């Protein structure tokens, strides 16, 4: 394997027992043998998401143990931003949205590894040759016709969720899927892997080596996704407490789009939270701090899914189907979908 990416590093999700496990591994002198990165934490790097002293201390223990193991503590769920995985290379990643992204859009090979297995694989330099590390295991098993048109970020997420709910498992082969930008590709990958066990889809004309996959496909199932299906997933929304972007982490283009839309309107009535990677945050420079004057809170290394900060809200509007799935389950907060343009409008309603 060339790289590893470790999930389950938020104190909210692994607690003291998880911290002790990482500290034990570090105490043995173990070190990762390949370039290894880490998922988001419960605490952001700039202190935007205020948390208790207990969470702060626990997250510090986890970060120190990871560093002792040689992990690059990137605290990002989008390692594909800075790891340019090549087709037909092997990786041990444990964040499902990232696995789906590199499998689908780069034909880099990773199975859905549990966080501890990815870490142990990083130390050993090897992982078990499970199905998605073989061409046989990557054979498409279902035909999916997408009759929706170019997919924006919300539509791409809904399509991913619908495929996941209808198929559940296997490898879908998509015809007619068109993603309008990078954010839509991210949201599709995140939703597909959130609403099913699938972490790989072959997109005709997009996935590297898609013709080879089509040649070996055994398409036992067949489904269609229409514009009416997508419309049926939407519902009327109320007034949110906050608007949230960045699940998965927003890239620099998305952050700049948000800031541009807000600057046109002036200070937002309701706060807009944007989670991104430390690398993108650094690129933004003074823009991140200046955004506070517009009621836009940009933070790095954490997200509203894995931070207890989220529990202070009652209603969140977002264009992320992954956030819609996880936040109610982890925090008991209502989350509803909106296209990103509509999400901006809701911040001024």
Label every PLM stretch briefly.
Residues 1-349:
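Non-transmembrane, aqueous-exposed alpha-helical and coiled segments at domain scale
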């Amino acid at each position: 394997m060339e790289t590893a990416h470790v999930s389950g590093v938020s104190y909210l999700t692994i607690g003291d027992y998880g911290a002790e496990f990482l500290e034990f591994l570090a105490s043995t002198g173990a070190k990762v043998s390949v370039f290894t990165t880490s998922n988001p934490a419960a605490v952001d790097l700039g202190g935007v998401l205020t948390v208790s002293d207990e969470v702060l201390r626990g997250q510090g223990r986890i970060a120190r143990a990871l560093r002792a193991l040689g992990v690059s503590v990137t605290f990002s769920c989008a390692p594909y931003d800075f790891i340019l995985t090549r087709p037909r290379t092997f990786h041990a990643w444990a964040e499902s949205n990232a696995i789906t992204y590199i499998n689908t859009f780069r034909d880099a090979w990773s199975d859905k590894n549990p966080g501890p297995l990815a870490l142990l694989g990083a130390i050993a330099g090897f992982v078990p040759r499970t199905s998605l590390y073989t061409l046989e295991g990557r054979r498409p098993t279902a035909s999916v016709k997408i009759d929706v048109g170019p997919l924006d970020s919300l539509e791409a997420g809904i399509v991913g969720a619908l495929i996941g709910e209808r198929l559940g498992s296997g490898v879908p082969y998509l015809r007619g899927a068109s993603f309008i930008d990078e954010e839509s590709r991210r949201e599709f990958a995140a939703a597909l892997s959130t609403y099913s066990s699938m972490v790989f889809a072959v997109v005709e004309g997009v996935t590297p080596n898609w013709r080879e996959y089509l040649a070996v496909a055994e398409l036992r199932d067949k489904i269609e996704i229409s514009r009416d299906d997508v419309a049926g997933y939407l519902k009327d929304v109320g007034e949110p407490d906050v608007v949230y972007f960045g699940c998965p982490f927003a890239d620099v283009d998305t952050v700049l789009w948000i800031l541009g839309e807000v600057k046109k309107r002036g200070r937002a009535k309701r706060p807009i939270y944007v989670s991104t990677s430390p690398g993108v945050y650094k690129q933004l420079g003074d823009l991140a701090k200046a955004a506070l004057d517009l009621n836009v809170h940009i933070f790095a290394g954490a997200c509203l899914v894995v931070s207890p900060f989220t529990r202070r809200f009652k209603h969140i509007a977002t264009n992320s189907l992954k956030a819609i799935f996880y936040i109610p389950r982890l925090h008991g907060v209502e989350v509803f979908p909106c296209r990103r343009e509509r999400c901006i409008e809701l911040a001024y309603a």
